[in-house]
């Protein structure tokens, strides 16, 4: 509670800033040591899932199929730490359901994904069957791991991925479908994805109308950064969506609307990392993934307080 109060006052999620703003009469150096002991508390590390379990029962109550957005983010580039987060899509900002820090070397690895899904399964209510929404960075091994839990998944497919008709070997690049897309979403029925590790799923197509957005990046700073070109190409490219949801459960238009909520998780990442618009976690020099997990838990408690 004191750490959340300090974060609300200083709006900077670092060890020293939390210590400097603790609402106690102790000297600053003792408050900083107090936060340091909190981040290194092994008992709290073990009980962390119990907190998320209580949190999940609260925000998922009454919804047997929550829309869960999942994505990676480079929280601390200098310390080479990544965070994998699951958020429940709501009106406006999504609310974090569960998140865990991993070393950069484990980003997008099957080991990290399986551990994350196992933790997520342990905190969700038993009567819940979530729809996991992810971007094109998640591949077939992720889809199959989600299916093993009896859950549904919805993901975008890009790049050199191939598809084929069921029972046939007529493999073609997924980019061949782009010319068939329009502003009216449609389903192509069930197809097979990836020749090396095939999976059967429903394929959908959609191309949104141009929004006329222009690059506003400064011409003096980072003007040659490659990210605007990458994001622009992704935004202009039609959506090829894949899902294991039965055709009769959701219409193509409903599935497109669900996937469009994925940007909510990007907004909450900015709320957490940005020094200008959020909690400034990017300035943290914490190098331990376990200690980072506690900092994420403090941020979640503040987010939940503001959401309520």
Q: Residue ranges of each PLM-predicted region?
A:
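Short beta-strand scaffold segments in enzyme catalytic cores
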Residues: 84-87
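Electropositive nucleic-acid engagement tracts
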Residues: 1-2, 6-62
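Two-metal-ion RNase H-like nuclease active-site motif
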Residues: 65-75
């Amino acid at each position: 509670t004191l750490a959340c109060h300090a974060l609300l006052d200083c709006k900077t999620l670092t060890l020293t800033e939390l210590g400097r703003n603790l609402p106690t009469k102790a000297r600053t150096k003792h408050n900083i040591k107090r936060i340091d002991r909190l981040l290194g508390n092994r008992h709290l590390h073990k009980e962390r899932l119990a907190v998320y379990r209580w949190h999940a029962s609260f925000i998922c109550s009454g919804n047997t199929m929550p829309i869960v957005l999942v994505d990676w983010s480079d929280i601390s580039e200098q310390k080479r730490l990544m965070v994998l987060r699951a958020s429940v899509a709501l009106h406006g900002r999504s609310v974090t359901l569960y998140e865990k820090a991993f070393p950069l070397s484990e980003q997008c690895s099957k080991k990290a994904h399986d551990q994350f899904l196992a933790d997520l399964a342990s905190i969700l209510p038993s009567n819940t069957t979530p729809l996991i929404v992810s971007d094109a960075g998640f591949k077939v091994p992720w889809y199959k791991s989600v299916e093993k839990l009896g859950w549904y998944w919805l993901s975008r497919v890009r790049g050199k991925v191939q598809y084929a008709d069921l029972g046939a070997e007529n493999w073609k690049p997924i980019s061949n479908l782009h010319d068939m897309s329009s502003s009216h979403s449609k389903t192509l029925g069930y197809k097979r994805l990836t020749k090396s590790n095939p999976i059967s799923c429903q394929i959908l197509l959609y191309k949104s109308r141009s929004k006329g957005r222009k690059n506003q990046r400064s011409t003096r700073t980072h003007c040659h950064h490659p990210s605007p070109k990458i994001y622009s190409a992704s935004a202009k490219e039609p959506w090829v969506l894949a899902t294991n949801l039965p055709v009769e459960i959701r219409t193509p238009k409903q599935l497109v609307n669900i996937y469009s909520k994925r940007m909510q998780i990007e907004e909450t990442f900015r709320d957490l990392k940005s020094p200008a618009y959020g909690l400034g976690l990017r300035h943290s020099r914490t190098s331990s993934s376990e200690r980072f997990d506690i900092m994420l838990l403090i941020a979640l408690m503040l987010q939940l307080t503001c959401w309520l």
